[in-house]
A protein has these predicted regions:
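Short hydrophobic beta-strand element within catalytic cores of glycosyltransferases
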Residues: 305-309, 315-319, 335
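Acidic donor-binding loop of glycosyltransferase active sites
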Residues: 287-301, 312-315
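Donor nucleotide-sugar binding/catalytic pocket of nucleotide-sugar-dependent glycosyltransferases
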Residues: 131, 154-206
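Conserved acidic donor-binding segment of nucleotide-sugar-dependent glycosyltransferases
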Residues: 334-341, 349-354
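Acceptor-binding helix/loop patch of EC 2.4 sugar-transfer enzymes
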Residues: 122-162, 223
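N-terminal subdomain of nucleotide-sugar transferases
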Residues: 1-65, 92
Length: 397
């Protein structure tokens, strides 16, 4: 049997099939890569570890080696990779290097000639446009009274643009979750290969047993220490939920996700709010919810939470911003509402109209299976690693 070629996968997020969007996107990429390559996963811990929900057993099952690196020891990444390759039979070398997110790109570049040869294909998965990310986060910090932090985010935009401009020539392919981000960056940097790699969601392995859908249960899913989600939860609890409960005080707002902040904890005091926090399995949450709400007012990329709800046949109400980057149609796949009054009315419609829920979820499920499956990601990544892009130069040293 011919041994698999080797791929280095560098990510600051621990790949995991449930939880935050970045962890889920990284897990899909790793699953696809591991079907073709012996993958060496390197995770520099640039952010605090989330214990109890994310486990490295999933990564170890999908990799040939897994190295978790303390931020003070990132200089050890290349020697670790070289030592691993030296211990493999037949003069092992890297065929592909895949960097997940801009922050780890320099660490991946430093390994390009590990074991004495350059990788055939180099990929930088940007996920989203980080400059747009800063531009949208700054007003949220201003609204929270954090003017200094807002100013800092704006001051970083020029530096991030310069950093990206320096990184792009080193990679054959630059991946983005949003087709809109792809178009924007292609127009700015026509010499480089930007590839739309949509987020993907897995079909549930089995339905939630013994769980009945409650049409009056409103679900929010997301990382609860991510500023746009903090703003969205507070916006819904303060401005939308009271309007809903004026009409039907049996309606409840269930908040599920990893992490937590002071602003999230503060919404506990509102009538009808159920702050659940992290759960090991989202299948029962989607199965029991009458709807998922995505009341985002800022953010970038695409919303995996919407794709998950579509896969689980849970109706969705979202702001325009929340559904940004997804080729979905209001009234066909989900309901779009931007003012508190419109959003409350949409939630009340779903709670009382079974036929509407059925029409939306049937269309939404068919759409997500067609456009956001792991098979879609597999096809696109195979095209990337099939041959380097003619538009982007080979890695330099």
């Amino acid at each position: 049997m011919t041994p698999k070629p080797y791929c280095l996968f560098v990510t600051s997020f621990l790949p995991y099939p449930t939880g935050g969007g970045s962890a889920m996107r990284a897990s899909v990429a790793l699953e696809v890569l591991s079907s073709r390559y012996s993958v060496i996963v390197v995770q520099p811990e640039l952010w605090a570890r989330r214990e109890g929900i994310f486990h490295d057993d999933w990564v170890r099952a999908h990799s040939a080696a897994f190295f978790r690196i303390h931020p003070h020891h990132v200089q050890d990444i290349r020697p670790l990779v070289e030592d691993f390759l030296a211990g493999e039979p037949g003069g092992a070398a890297l065929d592909v290097v895949y960097a997940f997110r801009q922050a780890v790109a320099p660490l991946a570049i430093n390994c390009f000639n590990a074991a004495g040869s350059r990788p055939r294909v180099t990929i930088l998965d940007l996920d989203d446009d980080e400059c747009a990310h800063n531009e949208q986060f700054a007003p949220l910090h201003e609204a929270a009274g954090e003017a200094a932090l807002a100013a800092k985010l704006r001051s970083e935009i020029a530096t991030k643009k310069l950093f990206l401009a320096m990184l792009m020539p080193r990679f054959n392919h630059l991946l983005l979750a949003s087709a809109d981000d792809c178009r924007t960056l292609r127009s700015r940097h026509p010499a480089h290969s930007f590839v739309h790699l949509p987020n993907a969601v897995r079909a549930p392995e089995s339905p939630a047993a013994g769980v009945n859908r409650d049409p009056r249960s409103i679900l929010f899913v997301g990382s609860l220490d991510y500023l746009p989600n903090e703003d969205a939860v507070a916006f819904f609890a303060r401005s939308i939920l009271p309007l809903i409960r004026e009409r039907d005080d049996r309606m409840t707002f269930r908040i599920v996700g990893v992490g937590q902040s002071e602003s999230i904890a503060a919404v506990r005091r509102f009538p009808g709010v159920r702050l659940i926090g992290a759960v090991p399995d989202l299948v029962p949450e989607y199965a029991s919810a009458g709807m998922l709400v995505v009341p985002l007012r800022a953010g970038s990329g695409t919303r995996i939470k919407i794709l998950e709800a579509f896969q689980h046949r849970t109706p969705v109400v979202s702001t325009t911003k929340g559904a940004e980057g997804l080729a979905v149609t209001n009234g066909e796949h989900l309901l779009i509402a931007d003012t508190p009054e419109e959003f409350a009315a949409a939630c009340l419609r779903l709670s009382s109209d079974d036929d509407l829920c059925r029409r939306l979820t049937e269309k939404a499920h068919a759409w997500v299976v067609q456009h956001h499956s792991i098979d879609t990601v597999r096809r696109i990544l195979r095209e990337c690693w099939g041959a380097p892009s003619i538009d982007s130069p080979r890695p330099r040293h």
